[in-house]
């Protein structure tokens, strides 16, 4: 199988733990187990007693029921635990959805900027991938009239990230509904990477709230400060494809670890604690960035971010990859280039 190099991982992974200043990571400050127990008011002795008695056999094949209940609670009442499939991380979720839905003869519409899996995997499977790019001219919003020109009766999937990686732009309720209506007109699935969803004082809509063929992917990595659990999930409103996703997941990871799922369940049952903590952390960081930008005429933000990422423009005549490499070499500062 031939597939494009996963560019962001090839850039970040060798440097992530070496940089003095890591601005390339978008995970909200990770918690320790002790911090997690304290934040969630979990009895430490009882937790470790439960952990000590836990079997190290395979875990639950669709996910720990307690965890699935907590995941469903991240959405409106239209989402039920039955619609949840627990998988290995957000990357596992994205891969499983793509491998499940992409079939010969399908075309895929990918809304950029986007996570590379969403267009490189379909391309590697031989699908026609039609790219729609949100850019500075549109303030990184979707022009649905233009997007509709890429969609036809052979479009199997429209995929995107909301909040976006890296701009931080998030579709509002009206935009989610417009996207659902466009997909509905041709019977296409919508797959939305929602891993940054939740860093807001207001409820952020999910594609699964508004569309019967909506699928969303996420994990505990970013908003919930626990990438090390490697717990991710897929929510699918269309239960007719869940079995196919489970079959594909069996080729990847069989199931998740029960210890990891227990920790993730506790975290997600206390989602508001993590939303509040990490929204405050991100807002403080955004305030620092805004203040810094006041004295930097060569830099400007693309849009106001609703995630833990920020996408900046500069007007220097230097390729972004060269700029990022020189910044790391000279200042031990890690950023991701666009």
Where is each model-derived feature located?
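Conserved PLP-anchoring active-site segment centered on the Schiff-base-forming lysine
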Residues: 82, 100-122
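Structural signature of PLP-dependent enzymes
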Residues: 242-249, 267-290
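N-terminal small-domain helix-loop-helix segment of the aminotransferase-like
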Residues: 2-89, 269
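Active-site PLP attachment segment
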Residues: 210-244, 256
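Conserved C-terminal alpha-helix-loop-beta "cap" of PLP-dependent enzymes
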Residues: 312-338
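Active-site phosphate-binding strand-loop segment of PLP-dependent enzymes
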Residues: 136-201
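A short helix->loop->beta-strand "cap" motif at the edges of active sites that frequently abuts
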Residues: 106, 127, 185-188, 212
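Conserved glycine-rich beta-strand-loop-beta hairpin in the small C-terminal domain of fold type I
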Residues: 265, 281-290, 300-314
């Amino acid at each position: 199988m031939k597939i494009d190099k996963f560019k962001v991982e090839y850039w970040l992974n060798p440097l992530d733990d070496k940089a003095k200043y890591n601005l390339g990571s978008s995970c909200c400050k990770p918690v320790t187990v002790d911090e997690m127990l304290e934040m969630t008011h979990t009895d430490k002795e009882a937790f470790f007693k439960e952990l000590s008695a836990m079997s190290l056999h395979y875990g639950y094949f669709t996910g720990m029921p307690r965890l699935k209940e907590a995941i469903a609670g991240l959405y409106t009442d239209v989402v039920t635990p039955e619609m949840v499939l627990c998988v290995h991380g957000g990357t596992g979720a994205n891969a499983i959805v793509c491998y499940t839905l992409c079939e010969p003869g399908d075309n895929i519409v990918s809304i950029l900027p986007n996570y590379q899996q969403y267009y490189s995997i379909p391309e590697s499977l031989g699908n026609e991938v039609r790219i729609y790019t949100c850019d500075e001219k549109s303030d990184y919003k979707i022009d649905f009239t233009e997007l509709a020109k890429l969609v036809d009766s052979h479009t199997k999937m429209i995929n995107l990230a909301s909040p976006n990686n890296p701009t931080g732009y998030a579709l509002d309720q009206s935009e989610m509904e417009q996207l659902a209506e466009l997909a509905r007109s041709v019977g296409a699935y919508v797959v939305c990477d929602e891993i940054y969803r939740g860093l807001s004082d207001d409820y952020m809509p999910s594609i699964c709230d508004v569309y019967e063929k909506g699928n969303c992917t996420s994990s505990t990595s970013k908003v919930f400060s626990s990438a090390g659990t490697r717990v991710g999930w897929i929510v699918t409103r269309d239960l007719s494809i869940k079995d196919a996703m489970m079959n594909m997941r069996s080729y990847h990871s069989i199931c998740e670890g029960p210890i990891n799922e227990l920790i993730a369940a506790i975290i997600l049952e206390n989602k508001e604690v993590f939303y509040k903590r990490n929204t405050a952390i991100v807002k403080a960081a955004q305030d620092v960035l805004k203040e810094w930008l006041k004295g930097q005429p060569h830099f400007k933000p693309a849009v106001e971010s609703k995630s833990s990422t920020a996408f900046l423009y500069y007007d220097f005549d230097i390729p972004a990859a060269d700029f990022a490499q020189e910044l790391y070499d000279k200042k031990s500062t890690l950023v991701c280039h666009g």
